[in-house]
């Protein structure tokens, strides 16, 4: 083996260069364990987990309860925007809370059940009709406000994900990227996401053929193809561009009243759900 390498100077030089390469050196060492104090190599992005620091600071000042709120479903072509507000119990915070987008469906479902058992929370919907009437941003902010107001106990401070504050009867603090920074917002993001995903699966039974149970109303190729083939359903947001194009193709579009499933406010405490028409 040594004789063959010596007879091929090009290969020997390559082997020597590889031994001297910093990339080879770093690859030879196992990666440091993740977590606090771990040293990360070049090109590795450290992802911070949400913390309870902001909520705990307010609690020490006597400001409690504190709620976090977030929404799911701004981007889809169909279904409601779902907003959630959560008041975590400082002594019973579920382990593993994170931005819902960084969790698998199985992780979200498991955490949703834990949040239901340990926290006070409320959910509000902005229906496709309201989205068409008010625009998606205003409808989302409206739903967030309604979710906070529907909490079983009025919060004294609210953290909301994003740039915009909402209309509530207490201090409201907007936190950009809050679902990845503030634990109560992360919990709200999970509640909103799981609730909306379940609703879209229910809509798939009400309107078969669109694949709502798979894509949850987002503009994936399969959804666009079904929309082009079948035309819009009552659950589609009629002013979103792909829906407008499909409606023009499938004239006339029958105007069907919205189902009771999309009552404007859903109050959720513990594991009980009641729809208010």
UniProtKB/Swiss-Prot annotation:
The keyword Transmembrane helix does not apply. Keywords: Cytoplasm, Endonuclease, Hydrolase, Manganese, Metal-binding, Nuclease. Endonuclease that specifically degrades the RNA of RNA-DNA hybrids. Pfam families: RNase_HII (PF01351). GO terms for cellular component: cytoplasm; ribonuclease H2 complex. Its cofactor is Mn(2+); Mg(2+). Residues 1-32 are annotated as: Disordered. SUPFAM superfamilies: Ribonuclease H-like. Its EC number is 3.1.26.4. PROSITE patterns: RNASE_H_2. A divalent metal cation binds at residues 70-71, 161. One of its GO terms (biological process) is mismatch repair. Its main location: cytoplasm. It comes from Bradyrhizobium sp. (strain ORS 278). InterPro entries: RNase_HII, RNase_HII/HIII, RNase_HII/HIII_dom, RNaseH-like_sf, RNaseH_sf. The lineage of its organism: Bacteria, Pseudomonadati, Pseudomonadota, Alphaproteobacteria, Hyphomicrobiales. This is Ribonuclease HII. Residues 64-252 form the RNase H type-2 domain. It comes from the Bacteria. Manganese or magnesium. Binds 1 divalent metal ion per monomer in the absence of substrate. May bind a second metal ion after substrate binding.
């Amino acid at each position: 083996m040594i004789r063959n390498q010596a007879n091929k100077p090009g290969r020997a030089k390559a082997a020597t260069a590889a031994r001297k390469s910093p990339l080879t050196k770093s690859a030879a060492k196992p990666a440091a364990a993740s977590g606090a104090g771990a040293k990360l190599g070049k090109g590795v992005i450290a992802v911070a987990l949400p913390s309870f620091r902001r909520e705990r600071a307010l609690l020490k000042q006597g400001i409690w309860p504190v709620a976090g709120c977030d929404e799911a479903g701004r981007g889809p072509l169909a279904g409601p925007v779902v907003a959630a507000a959560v008041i975590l119990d400082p002594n019973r915070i579920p382990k593993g809370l994170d931005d819902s987008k960084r969790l698998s469906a199985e992780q979200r479902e498991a955490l949703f059940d834990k949040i239901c058992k340990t926290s006070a929370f409320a959910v509000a919907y902005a229906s496709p009709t309201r989205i068409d009437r008010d625009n998606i941003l205003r409808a989302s902010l409206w739903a967030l406000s309604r979710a906070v107001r529907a909490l079983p106990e009025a919060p004294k401070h609210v953290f909301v994900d994003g740039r915009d504050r909402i209309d509530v009867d207490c201090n409201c603090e907007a936190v950009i990227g809050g679902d990845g920074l503030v634990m109560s917002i992360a919990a709200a993001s999970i509640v909103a996401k799981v609730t909306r995903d379940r609703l879209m699966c229910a809509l798939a039974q009400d309107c078969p053929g669109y694949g709502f149970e798979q894509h949850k109303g987002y503009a994936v190729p399969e959804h666009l193809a079904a929309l082009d083939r079948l035309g819009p359903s009552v659950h589609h947001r009629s002013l979103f561009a792909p829906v407008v194009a499909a409606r023009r193709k499938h004239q006339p579009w029958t105007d069907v009243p919205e189902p009771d499933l999309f009552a404007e406010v859903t109050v959720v405490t513990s594991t009980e759900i009641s729809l208010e028409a």
